[in-house]
Amino acid sequence: MKKQLIIIAILFFITLSTAFAQNAGEFVVPLTDPNKRGKLKAHLNYGSITIKGSPRKDVLVKYKAIAEGEEDDDDRDEEKRLKPLPRINTKTNSGSDGKNAGLKKISGGTMDLEVTENDNSVRVNSDSWSNKLKLEIELPSGFDLNVSTYNDGDLVISNIQGELEINNYNGEINAENISGSVVATTYNGEIKVTFDKVTEATPMSFSTFNGDIDLTFPASLKATFKMKTEQGEILSGFDMAMIKSGPIQKKDTKSGTYKVVIDEWVKGEINGGGPEFSIKNYNGDIIIRKK
């Protein structure tokens, strides 16, 4: 069995190496047991990831290298985000003699994309800082996700039934038709999530520094919200029973130090309350919509 896995891995690597020469392509990753739930862990240092749930029984991965100066189809209004982090320069300086004048760049650097599957756990990873990638992944709807990207790319997810952990740094997070729970964090970009159904008794968390947090929940939602924004408004389509929060008194038993903390969080209950949903923003609004 081990020998068979090694052979499969070698063939898979050869296939990818050949395909990468074209800078774009796709391949199918079979699951160990298509009838069981799966988990996807996907990470890019530089680029965007789109994930779509479907009735399929395997995982389809499409990849494309975004050339320098080429716009990603998922790029948003650049005025809403900070300037992307600088790329690592992999090109040789041609100097002022113009020795490369008239030549076309065919490729530079490596795509560095690794894909593995073990017992329905699929891992898609690229640690490249010099080549921007666009990944499109189609998989069974019943998957748990751990997805992250760092620089100049958005995370777009749809039609998933499971637990989602979504992390970005310089880009947006957009998830729709979600049944389950979500923990979403980005630094420079908005967060927009639409739920068809939420997992009962499961806390959630949403956080960004620069951009709106826009969440849509079913009308039957029962939750306790803990919300905070420094430079924005909090808006709700639900009737929310507000919870008063006064100064919090604390005393360190070891040092004897006594202090009073003013709680700046806004707290409220929907439909009698439930698990805590923490929503933190700095420069943007918090919007809670009723579906």
Regions found by a protein language model. Name each.
Residues 49, 191, 234-235, 286-288:
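Short loop/beta submotifs within extracellular cysteine-rich repeat domains
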